[in-house]
């Protein structure tokens, strides 16, 4: 009997045995029952293993023994059986994991030890990787000073210069900036390495270099080897996993789907081969493994599974099970939290088989306990299974720091220390620096090499302190025993023969091409389902347009009696082709939005580009049938096209091919452009060329010989020819109207009048061309994604000082003042000694002398504050009866001048809510209770003038410098009587205080893209508020997302601010000991919006600890433990339930509460001789000054925005030259109607395309600035009108230049009549048309929540404006029920003005004897006498859209708080 039969027999024995056992069981003695049943089970288990072992090895590794049945999947009541692990369902996988790793914290280590034990028993070595790097150097090319600022002028000169460099005719003015300098070291397997270093020290560059992922924008030298093998000998991307600090994921996929897809692409590595060998050796040694471990290893080693048990395991150890089936989300789609997203980024690489991990800042947004759990799980994996890991962390808590074996400390691109964690303090003590008792070692290491922080750690009081440079540390480390040991080890090359054959990956991809294609197909289907709204909206949009088209070109109004009426049918066909083409436009955005994730996965070698591009094409075909069907089926017979059913289906078939071609074209453009602004411009450009040379706007005979090649390669030409031939060669047109010598049918006459080939075969030529273009564009799309790199976001420019300092640090020279941070002028943060304080300020003058500008210290007290919102519909649906949800429940407290208060609590406690209520930033909800400012009731108008609010998201205009941001804030927020010089002195003082002097001319940039780092951005946020000279400052999480040193810099800024006598309140999340103890008082809240402690912290948090330890049952704090962490742990809801207490009640019965109440009462009474805050006007500055300031900032922003302005000028100039050459000399002579149509075609195409380009490209610019506007308006800087004024007015000069450049080039080349009046009329209409298009785009942003919706809303009107412009169908031929819209369509008025100003007064007769003027009046309905009115209406449209933008900005606030 074969082995499979044996397994069947075992299963039947199990069934029969159980029945027999049941019948006799009642007669047995109790103890015998248990002994028999367990004996029987053992026998059956043995039989199963025996049967399993008889299987061939290949089959044996695919099958495992698992519990069967049971409702919970745990196998209860179902017995065990042999299962094919390839088909394990979610329930079986979950049950298996539940048995192996029930609680990740407790069971993971035991589980890994079982895995290791199984492998060790048969003597299999696990592959390990030792990474060595020797003399690693990296340099970046940067522009120094102002030449690096991205102004329109710089962008043009820099582009020309780079072209000159490439040709070798111009010298390279860029300078090199060192990033890494001569770093060498060894990363050992089975050891956890922590990478530390201040911001900009080169941590990311080092990790990228070690992972073999260094970009081509850096000049690198040196050697990195894995087990002695150079990078070229294996595939580093698959051997090592680099986990980026940027979280790039597809928002529409769930966490589980994201990880499962990643696991599918990365494959299982050598797991299957190892398992086969393991199984063979176990069989030979007659070893029976643990059934669950066997099942897990087999399931994890199977490639090609849609869901792998390893994915479920990673979800568990990363704590992502709770959100496994939640969408990841993005800025448009609500999803998981930032911390969870960070863990998904980590999990995405952990599910793969890589044995070396390089992890960049994986703890951002995570609380310390989650970080500890993740790092601990990684540590267990590395130690037990022999992995290699280098992890950089921002603010590791002491308990997380202690999990690491080795430390690498980087500073200024050099390794200051590398080696065992235990020896690091010894090294620094040998240099004279000591870590204080209450200081985290990681925090100490990040600060000890910094000029500003070093002095406080100097421990040799017998010697005077002298700044020790990084170079001195580096050379001292080389003679330190750890440094010598590393140098000695590096001197002996790694023995390549000792490298495990499975350690290094040599195949390019982790799975076969067929499997990767299948994975991408499955993902694309999933995304199409999730994005179904886009396709439904697209279809709906097409339906709406088809309804307009069929009622506009209505069959009762459509005659077949002349060539002119045939032209109207041609217009209807042209419009149909254009709409089907435009329908594919949304592919552009869908492609570009997915590219960042694609590039990440491509570069990690998840899959080749072809496996991504094929599904994105093939799977869209079924949708095309629906979309095109909707248009053709609705319009064909209603418009009255040829009644032959064959012609109908041929039109449908051709439209399908056109839609496929258009979708492929836009996918290719998106893939080649890789950026939404460039893609939009490029797509508009391609559409324009294809359209103008497509044979409808300009007849073939009129195309100049130098452009005829463009006619032959235009897909629109083939589409237009094919669809025209299909209609006009049909039965309905097969009649002779005006008998001519040739007796041509009417259809042929119409085709010839428009220059179309009157041959039936052109239908199939056109159809074949559409298929050919579709294949070509998809091939080009694949090539673009295979070879193009994403745009770099590296810094292109640095200041002269920064470069000088970088170079000086390399040489060990000292630049600038070092003794910035020695003594202390405030209460020390640590144990009271001077050396212990991190957040200090040596400059006694700054804190003691007061600022240049005086301010009035103010206190803020609040009593019984309640805040509620309308009950969310989801909660009402769950049966909650209340109408309101209360978020703050009677909170009372006070904040005083010169006192730094921390506002803390777990997530959901209401910290930010309370701060928003007190600061008056809430845009909805219901507020009750009293809030007083120095005893007077708070009035929001005056309060905004004396308060500052530093938001958690650092929102600033990206195109201005640090100094300009501060100047703008001070200009609008300081009183009018402060003169310009005093204002500038005050800004200088604030920059000194906030340590921004070195960044004075740095561009702010966009977060995560370019410009300032997170920590610099935080300091700018604080400075922007400080220059307003406020008395009260609110700060929302000023240290989140920062490393320890950056957080210390920010906190030093905050402390300096308090020392000037201001009232400062900060919400803070998971602070380190020294940051926490920098605060004077704490206001602690619990979930649900109630306070549980409000009072002083005391020396070493003694007051806080005393208060909570006095509550019965609360556990005592351990020595050296962070009081902030302890406090949050002992006050959780779980603790309340365990102790049976309510911390809020305890607080309200305490003596502390009574003291606080008395203080609130005291602060609620105005001081004698004081007066309430009063300002004569709502804003500091007059409306005129506000307008000037807003215009000043917009001017800077626009000048420094080349992607917007330089691209628009370039695009306009190129189009002007193209139009000039295409329509060369066609405007001068009008001898027949086609000449007029050609000239009008040039006007129509330019107006529509340049106008639409202006409209789409302004939207992202306005959307970014609007976010800044919300913050600045809330801060009381200006009203809505000055902002709208600045945004509108700054467009005028740029549009004027754009229209003038276009007008001069085109007017001269097309050869319109050279009279001053006609030229200036032409210019006038172009200027105001481009303005109203631009203002229309701005208005769409103003009326919608974000720019994605704005682009959808605005694009809905493009098609309608196109249709009613008067070119496709002239106004007199429009049915009466639609004629009103001809007067409401701005483009129709523009064409009216342009045509009538050029041709409306020409009396010269055409070939048929009709004067041009009469033809214009009869055919188009354009009268020259109306010219003045037309001009007024066109200008009025610009004014109307600008006014609506201003109105929308004033009335709508889409920011929900």
Swiss-Prot record:
Superkingdom of origin: Eukaryota
Ranges of Basic and acidic residues composition bias in the record: 28-39
Residue ranges of every copy of the ABC transporter domain listed in the record: 164-437, 860-1112
Record's subcellular location: Membrane
Keyword ATP-binding listed: yes
Keyword ATP-binding applies: yes
Keywords for the protein's UniProt record, in alphabetical order: ATP-binding, Membrane, Nucleotide-binding, Repeat, Transmembrane, Transmembrane helix, Transport
Domain ABC transmembrane type-2, first and last residues per copy: 515-728, 1185-1399
GO molecular function, one term: ATP binding
Mode of membrane association: Multi-pass membrane protein
Chain spans, region Disordered: 14-43, 821-841
Residues given in the record as ATP 1 binding sites: 197-204
Transmembrane intervals: 533-553, 565-585, 621-641, 653-673, 677-697, 706-726, 765-785, 1209-1229, 1244-1264, 1292-1312, 1319-1339, 1349-1369, 1380-1400, 1429-1449
Signal peptide range: none
GO CC terms in record: membrane
Residues holding ATP 2: 905-912
Family listed: Belongs to the ABC transporter superfamily. ABCG family. PDR (TC 3.A.1.205) subfamily.
Role description: May be a general defense protein.
Name used for this protein in its record: ABC transporter G family member 36
Recorded name of the encoding gene: ABCG36
């Amino acid at each position: 009997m074969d082995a499979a039969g044996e397994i069947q027999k075992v299963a039947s024995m199990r069934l029969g045995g159980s029945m027999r056992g049941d019948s006799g069981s009642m007669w047995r003695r109790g103890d015998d029952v248990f002994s028999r049943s367990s004996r029987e089970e053992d026998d059956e288990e043995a039989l199963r293993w025996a049967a399993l072992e008889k299987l061939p090895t290949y089959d044996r590794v695919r099958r495992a023994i698992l519990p069967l049945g049971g409702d919970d999947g745990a196998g209860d009541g179902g017995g065990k059986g042999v299962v094919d692990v390839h088909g394990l369902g979610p329930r079986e996988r979950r049950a298996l994991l539940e048995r192996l790793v029930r609680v990740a914290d407790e069971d993971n280590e035991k589980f890994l030890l079982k895995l290791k034990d199984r492998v060790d028993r048969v003597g299999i070595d696990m592959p390990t990787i030792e990474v060595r790097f020797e003399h690693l150097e990296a340099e970046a090319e940067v522009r120094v000073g102002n030449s690096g600022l991205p102004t329109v002028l710089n962008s043009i000169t820099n582009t020309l210069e780079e072209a000159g460099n490439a040709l070798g005719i111009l010298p390279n003015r860029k300078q090199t900036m060192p990033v890494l300098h001569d770093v060498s070291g060894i990363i050992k397997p089975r050891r956890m390495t922590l990478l530390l270093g201040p911001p900009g020290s080169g941590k990311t560059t080092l990790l990228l270099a070690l992972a073999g992922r260094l970009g081509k924008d850096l000049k690198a030298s040196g050697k990195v080897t894995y087990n002695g093998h150079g990078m070229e000998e294996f595939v580093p991307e698959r051997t090592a996993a680099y986990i980026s600090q940027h979280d790039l994921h597809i928002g529409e996929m769930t966490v589980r789907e994201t990880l499962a897809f990643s696991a599918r692409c990365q494959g299982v590595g050598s797991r299957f081969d190892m398992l086969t060998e393991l199984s063979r050796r176990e069989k030979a040694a007659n070893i029976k493994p643990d059934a669950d471990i066997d099942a897990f290893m087999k399931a994890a080693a199977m490639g090609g599974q849609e869901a792998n048990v390893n994915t479920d395991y990673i979800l568990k150890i990363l704590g992502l099970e709770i959100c496994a089936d939640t969408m990841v989300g993005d800025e448009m789609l609500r999803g998981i939290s930032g911390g969870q997203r960070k863990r998904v980024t980590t999990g995405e690489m952990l599910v793969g088989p890589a044995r070396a991990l390089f992890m960049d800042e994986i703890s951002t947004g995570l609380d310390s306990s989650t970080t500890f759990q993740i790092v601990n799980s990684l540590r267990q994996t590395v130690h037990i299974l022999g992995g290699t890991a280098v992890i950089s962390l921002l603010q590791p808590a002491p308990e997380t720091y202690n999990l690491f074996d080795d430390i690498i400390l980087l500073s200024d691109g050099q390794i200051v220390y590398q080696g065992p964690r235990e020896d690091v303090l010894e090294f620094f003590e040998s240099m004279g620096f000591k870590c204080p008792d209450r200081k985290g070692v990681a925090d100490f290491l990040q600060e000890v090499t910094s000029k500003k922080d070093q002095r406080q750690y100097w421990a040799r009081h017998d010697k005077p302190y002298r700044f020790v440079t990084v170079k001195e540390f580096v050379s001292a480390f080389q003679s330190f025993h750890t440094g010598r040991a590393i140098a000695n080890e590096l001197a002996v090359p790694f023995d390549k023969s000792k490298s495990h054959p499975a350690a290094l990956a040599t195949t390019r991809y982790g799975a076969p091409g067929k499997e990767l294609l299948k994975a991408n197909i499955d993902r694309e289907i999933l995304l199409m389902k999730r994005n179904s709204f886009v396709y439904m909206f697209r279809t709906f949009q097409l339906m709406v347009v088809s309804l307009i088209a069929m009622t506009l070109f209505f069959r009762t109004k459509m005659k077949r009696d002349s060539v002119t009426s045939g032209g109207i049918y041609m217009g209807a066909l042209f419009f149909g082709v254009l709409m089907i083409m435009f329908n594919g436009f949304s592919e552009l955005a869908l492609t570009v939005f997915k590219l960042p994730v694609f590039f990440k996965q491509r570069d990690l070698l998840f899959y080749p580009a072809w496996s991504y591009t094929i599904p994105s094409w093939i799977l869209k075909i079924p949708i095309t049938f629906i979309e095109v069907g909707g248009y053709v089926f609705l319009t064909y017979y209603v418009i009255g096209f040829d009644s032959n059913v064959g012609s109908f289906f041929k039109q449908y078939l051709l439209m399908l091919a056109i839609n496929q071609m258009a979708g492929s074209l836009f996918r290719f453009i998106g893939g080649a452009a890789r950026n939404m602004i460039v893609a939009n411009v490029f797509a508009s450009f391609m559409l324009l060329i294809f359209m103008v040379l497509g044979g409808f706007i300009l007849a073939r005979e009129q195309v100049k010989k130098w452009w005829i090649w463009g006619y032959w390669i235009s897909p629109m030409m083939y589409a237009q020819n094919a669809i025209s031939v299909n209609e006009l060669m049909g039965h309905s047109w097969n009649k002779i109207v005006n008998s001519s010598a040739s007796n041509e049918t009417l259809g042929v006459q119409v085709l010839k009048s428009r220059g179309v080939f009157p041959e039936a075969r052109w239908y199939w030529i056109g159809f074949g061309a559409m298929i050919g273009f579709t294949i070509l564009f998809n091939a080009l799309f694949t090539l673009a994604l295979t070879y193009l790199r994403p745009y770099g976001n590296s810094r292109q420019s640095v200041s002269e000082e920064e470069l000088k300092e970088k170079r000086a640090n390399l040489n060990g020279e000292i630049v600038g003042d070092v003794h910035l941070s020695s003594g202390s002028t405030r209460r020390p943060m640590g144990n009271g000694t001077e050396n212990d304080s991190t957040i200090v300020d040596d400059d006694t003058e700054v804190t003691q002398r007061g600022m240049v500008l005086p301010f009035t210290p103010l206190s803020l007290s609040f009593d019984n504050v309640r805040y509620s919102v309308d009950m969310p519909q989801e909660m009402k649906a769950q049966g909650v009866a209340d109408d309101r949800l209360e978020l703050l429940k009677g909170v009372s407290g006070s904040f005083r001048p010169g006192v730094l208060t921390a506002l803390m609590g777990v997530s959901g406690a209401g910290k930010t809510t309370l701060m928003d209520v007190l600061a008056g930033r809430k845009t909805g909800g219901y507020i009750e209770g009293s809030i007083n400012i120095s005893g007077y009731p708070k009035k929001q108008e005056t309060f905004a003038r004396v308060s500052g609010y530093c938001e958690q998201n650092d929102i600033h205009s990206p195109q201005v410098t640090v100094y300009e941001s501060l100047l703008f804030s001070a200009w609008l927020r300081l009183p009018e009587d402060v003169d310009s010089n005093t204002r500038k002195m005050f800004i200088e003082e604030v920059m000194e205080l906030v340590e921004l002097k070195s960044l004075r001319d740095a561009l702010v940039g966009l977060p995560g893209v370019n410009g300032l780092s997170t920590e610099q951005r935080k300091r700018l946020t604080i400075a922007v508020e400080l220059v307003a000279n406020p008395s009260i400052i609110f700060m929302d999480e000023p240290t989140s997302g920062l490393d320890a040193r950056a957080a210390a810099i920010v906190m030093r800024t905050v402390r300096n601010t308090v020392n000037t006598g201001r009232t400062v309140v900060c919400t803070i999340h998971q602070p380190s000991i020294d940051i926490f103890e920098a605060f004077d008082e704490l206001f602690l809240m619990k979930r649900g919006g109630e306070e549980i402690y409000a009072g002083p912290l005391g020396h070493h948090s003694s007051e806080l600890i005393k208060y909570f330890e006095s509550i019965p049952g609360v556990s005592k704090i351990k020595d050296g433990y962070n009081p902030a962490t302890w406090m949050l742990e002992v006050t959780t809801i779980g603790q309340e339930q365990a102790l049976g207490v309510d911390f809020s009640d305890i607080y309200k019965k305490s003596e502390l509460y009574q003291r606080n109440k008395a203080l609130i009462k005291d602060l609620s009474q105005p001081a004698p001789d004081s007066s309430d805050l009063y300002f004569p006007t709502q804003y500091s500055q007059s409306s005129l000054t506000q307008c000037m300031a807003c215009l000043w900032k917009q001017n800077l922003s626009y000048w420094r925005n080349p992607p917007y302005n330089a691209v628009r000028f370039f695009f306009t100039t190129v189009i002007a030259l193209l139009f000039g050459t295409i329509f060369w000399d066609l405007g001068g002579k009008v001898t027949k109607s086609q000449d007029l149509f050609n000239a009008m075609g040039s006007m129509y195409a330019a107006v529509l395309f340049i106008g639409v380009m202006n409209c789409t490209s302004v939207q992202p610019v306005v959307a970014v600035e609007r976010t800044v506007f919300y913050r600045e308006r809330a801060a009381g800087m200006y009203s809505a009108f000055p902002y709208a004024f600045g945004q509108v007015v700054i467009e005028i000069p740029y549009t004027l230049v754009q229209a003038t450049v276009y007008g001069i080039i085109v007017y001269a080349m097309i050869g319109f009549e050279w009279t001053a009046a006609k030229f200036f009329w032409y210019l006038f209409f172009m200027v105001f048309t481009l303005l109203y298009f631009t203002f229309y785009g701005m208005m769409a942003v103003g009326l919608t929540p974000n720019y994605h919706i704005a682009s959808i809303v605005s694009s809905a009107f493009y098609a309608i404006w196109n249709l009613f412009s008067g070119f496709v169908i002239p106004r007199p031929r429009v049915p009466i029920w639609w004629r009103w819209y001809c007067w409401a369509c701005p483009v129709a008025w523009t064409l009216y003005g342009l045509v009538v100003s050029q041709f409306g007064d020409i009396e010269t007769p055409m070939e048929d004897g009709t004067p041009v003027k009469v033809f214009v009046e009869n055919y188009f309905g354009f009268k020259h006498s109306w010219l003045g009115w037309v001009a007024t209406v066109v200008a009025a449209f610009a004014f109307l859209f600008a006014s609506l933008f201003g109105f929308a900005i004033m009335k709508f606030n889409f920011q929900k708080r």
